[in-house]
A protein has these predicted regions:
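Shared catalytic-loop signature of beta/alpha-barrel
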Residues: 62, 68, 77-179
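Metal-dependent enolase-superfamily TIM-barrel catalytic cores that perform enediolate-based chemistry
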Residues: 1-85, 90-91
Length: 179
Protein backbone atom coordinates (compact mmCIF):
# COMPACT_ATOMS: atom_id res chain seq x y z
CA UNK A 1 0.00 0.00 0.00
CA UNK A 2 2.84 2.39 0.84
CA UNK A 3 4.45 1.72 -2.56
CA UNK A 4 1.21 2.52 -4.39
CA UNK A 5 0.71 5.72 -2.39
CA UNK A 6 4.32 6.78 -3.00
CA UNK A 7 3.63 6.68 -6.74
CA UNK A 8 0.78 9.16 -6.49
CA UNK A 9 -2.23 6.86 -6.41
CA UNK A 10 -5.32 8.35 -4.80
CA UNK A 11 -6.43 4.97 -3.48
CA UNK A 12 -4.95 1.63 -2.50
CA UNK A 13 -6.80 -1.65 -2.48
CA UNK A 14 -6.40 -4.48 -0.02
CA UNK A 15 -7.43 -8.01 -0.83
CA UNK A 16 -7.04 -11.46 0.66
CA UNK A 17 -4.37 -13.10 -1.45
CA UNK A 18 -2.90 -15.23 1.31
CA UNK A 19 -5.82 -16.25 3.51
CA UNK A 20 -5.53 -13.24 5.78
CA UNK A 21 -9.25 -13.36 6.58
CA UNK A 22 -8.93 -16.96 7.79
CA UNK A 23 -7.91 -15.24 11.04
CA UNK A 24 -10.13 -12.19 11.50
CA UNK A 25 -7.83 -10.47 13.99
CA UNK A 26 -4.88 -10.95 11.62
CA UNK A 27 -6.94 -9.46 8.79
CA UNK A 28 -7.97 -6.47 10.88
CA UNK A 29 -4.35 -5.92 11.98
CA UNK A 30 -3.24 -5.92 8.36
CA UNK A 31 -5.89 -3.36 7.42
CA UNK A 32 -4.84 -1.13 10.31
CA UNK A 33 -1.23 -1.41 9.13
CA UNK A 34 -2.29 -0.47 5.58
CA UNK A 35 -4.14 2.59 6.82
CA UNK A 36 -1.15 3.62 8.93
CA UNK A 37 1.21 3.13 5.97
CA UNK A 38 -0.79 5.25 3.53
CA UNK A 39 -2.13 7.82 5.97
CA UNK A 40 -5.40 9.64 5.67
CA UNK A 41 -4.81 11.29 2.30
CA UNK A 42 -4.99 8.06 0.28
CA UNK A 43 -8.26 6.13 0.11
CA UNK A 44 -8.28 2.54 1.41
CA UNK A 45 -10.44 0.09 -0.57
CA UNK A 46 -11.05 -3.39 0.84
CA UNK A 47 -12.01 -6.38 -1.34
CA UNK A 48 -13.48 -9.24 0.71
CA UNK A 49 -13.94 -11.62 -2.27
CA UNK A 50 -17.39 -12.80 -1.09
CA UNK A 51 -15.82 -14.75 1.81
CA UNK A 52 -18.01 -13.77 4.77
CA UNK A 53 -21.42 -14.66 6.09
CA UNK A 54 -23.74 -11.86 7.24
CA UNK A 55 -22.75 -11.83 10.95
CA UNK A 56 -19.03 -11.81 10.12
CA UNK A 57 -19.46 -9.10 7.46
CA UNK A 58 -21.26 -6.89 9.97
CA UNK A 59 -18.60 -7.57 12.62
CA UNK A 60 -15.74 -6.69 10.29
CA UNK A 61 -17.58 -3.64 8.93
CA UNK A 62 -17.94 -2.32 12.48
CA UNK A 63 -14.32 -3.11 13.36
CA UNK A 64 -12.93 -1.22 10.34
CA UNK A 65 -15.16 1.84 10.73
CA UNK A 66 -12.30 3.86 12.34
CA UNK A 67 -10.17 3.21 9.24
CA UNK A 68 -12.50 5.32 7.08
CA UNK A 69 -12.64 2.92 4.12
CA UNK A 70 -13.48 4.22 0.68
CA UNK A 71 -15.39 0.99 0.08
CA UNK A 72 -16.11 -2.43 1.51
CA UNK A 73 -16.21 -4.64 -1.58
CA UNK A 74 -18.18 -7.86 -1.94
CA UNK A 75 -18.28 -9.03 1.67
CA UNK A 76 -20.93 -11.69 0.91
CA UNK A 77 -21.58 -14.13 -1.93
CA UNK A 78 -23.20 -12.38 -4.88
CA UNK A 79 -26.37 -14.48 -4.83
CA UNK A 80 -27.25 -13.19 -1.35
CA UNK A 81 -28.89 -9.98 -2.54
CA UNK A 82 -30.99 -9.37 0.57
CA UNK A 83 -28.04 -10.00 2.89
CA UNK A 84 -25.86 -7.69 0.79
CA UNK A 85 -28.61 -5.06 0.99
CA UNK A 86 -28.57 -5.45 4.78
CA UNK A 87 -24.82 -4.78 4.86
CA UNK A 88 -25.32 -1.78 2.56
CA UNK A 89 -28.10 -0.33 4.70
CA UNK A 90 -26.80 -1.08 8.18
CA UNK A 91 -23.00 -1.47 8.22
CA UNK A 92 -22.00 2.17 7.97
CA UNK A 93 -19.73 1.23 5.06
CA UNK A 94 -19.92 2.20 1.41
CA UNK A 95 -20.37 -1.11 -0.39
CA UNK A 96 -19.22 -2.04 -3.88
CA UNK A 97 -19.60 -5.10 -6.05
CA UNK A 98 -20.28 -6.72 -9.38
CA UNK A 99 -16.81 -7.20 -10.82
CA UNK A 100 -17.66 -10.64 -12.23
CA UNK A 101 -21.32 -10.05 -13.18
CA UNK A 102 -22.48 -10.56 -16.75
CA UNK A 103 -25.07 -8.38 -18.46
CA UNK A 104 -27.64 -5.87 -17.31
CA UNK A 105 -30.00 -8.39 -15.72
CA UNK A 106 -27.53 -9.42 -13.04
CA UNK A 107 -26.60 -5.81 -12.28
CA UNK A 108 -30.27 -4.80 -12.23
CA UNK A 109 -30.99 -7.24 -9.39
CA UNK A 110 -28.28 -5.58 -7.33
CA UNK A 111 -29.40 -2.05 -8.17
CA UNK A 112 -33.11 -2.58 -7.54
CA UNK A 113 -32.35 -4.68 -4.46
CA UNK A 114 -30.16 -1.87 -3.07
CA UNK A 115 -27.38 -4.41 -2.56
CA UNK A 116 -24.51 -1.95 -3.17
CA UNK A 117 -23.72 1.74 -3.28
CA UNK A 118 -21.24 1.30 -6.14
CA UNK A 119 -21.40 -1.06 -9.14
CA UNK A 120 -18.13 -2.37 -10.56
CA UNK A 121 -18.72 -3.71 -14.08
CA UNK A 122 -15.67 -5.26 -15.69
CA UNK A 123 -15.66 -4.80 -19.48
CA UNK A 124 -14.36 -8.32 -20.09
CA UNK A 125 -17.07 -9.94 -17.92
CA UNK A 126 -20.05 -7.59 -18.19
CA UNK A 127 -20.44 -7.75 -21.96
CA UNK A 128 -18.16 -5.10 -23.44
CA UNK A 129 -17.98 -1.32 -23.49
CA UNK A 130 -21.51 -0.76 -24.79
CA UNK A 131 -23.05 -3.09 -22.21
CA UNK A 132 -21.07 -1.40 -19.42
CA UNK A 133 -22.44 1.96 -20.56
CA UNK A 134 -25.98 0.54 -20.45
CA UNK A 135 -25.32 -0.84 -16.96
CA UNK A 136 -24.07 2.58 -15.87
CA UNK A 137 -27.20 4.25 -17.25
CA UNK A 138 -29.36 1.77 -15.36
CA UNK A 139 -27.37 2.49 -12.19
CA UNK A 140 -27.68 6.25 -12.67
CA UNK A 141 -31.48 6.00 -12.64
CA UNK A 142 -31.17 4.52 -9.13
CA UNK A 143 -28.46 7.00 -8.03
CA UNK A 144 -25.78 4.32 -7.88
CA UNK A 145 -22.17 5.18 -8.75
CA UNK A 146 -20.05 3.12 -11.15
CA UNK A 147 -16.40 2.21 -10.68
CA UNK A 148 -15.22 0.14 -13.65
CA UNK A 149 -13.14 -2.86 -12.59
CA UNK A 150 -10.10 -3.21 -14.85
CA UNK A 151 -7.24 -5.19 -13.29
CA UNK A 152 -6.49 -7.49 -16.24
CA UNK A 153 -3.78 -5.53 -18.03
CA UNK A 154 -3.50 -2.45 -20.22
CA UNK A 155 -6.19 -3.34 -22.77
CA UNK A 156 -8.73 -3.96 -20.03
CA UNK A 157 -7.69 -0.76 -18.28
CA UNK A 158 -8.08 1.31 -21.44
CA UNK A 159 -11.51 -0.22 -22.06
CA UNK A 160 -12.43 0.78 -18.50
CA UNK A 161 -11.16 4.30 -19.21
CA UNK A 162 -13.42 4.47 -22.27
CA UNK A 163 -16.42 3.52 -20.14
CA UNK A 164 -15.44 5.98 -17.42
CA UNK A 165 -15.12 8.84 -19.90
CA UNK A 166 -18.67 8.37 -21.18
CA UNK A 167 -20.79 7.92 -18.05
CA UNK A 168 -22.06 10.66 -15.72
CA UNK A 169 -22.03 8.47 -12.59
CA UNK A 170 -18.35 7.47 -12.85
CA UNK A 171 -16.63 7.40 -9.46
CA UNK A 172 -13.21 5.76 -9.70
CA UNK A 173 -11.38 3.32 -11.97
CA UNK A 174 -9.98 0.25 -10.26
CA UNK A 175 -6.86 -1.12 -11.93
CA UNK A 176 -3.88 -3.25 -10.90
CA UNK A 177 -0.86 -1.12 -10.09
CA UNK A 178 2.43 -2.55 -11.26
CA UNK A 179 1.01 -5.66 -12.89
Amino acid sequence: ARHVAAHGATGAGHQDRDGVWDDVEKGLARLRACREAIGGEVELLVDCHCRFDLPLAMRIAAAVRPLNLFWFEEPLPRDQIEANAHVTAHSGQTTAGGESFFGRAEFERYVTGRAVHILMPDVKHAGGITECRRIAHQAEIHQVHVAPHSPAGPVSTMAGVQVAATIPNFLILEWAFGE
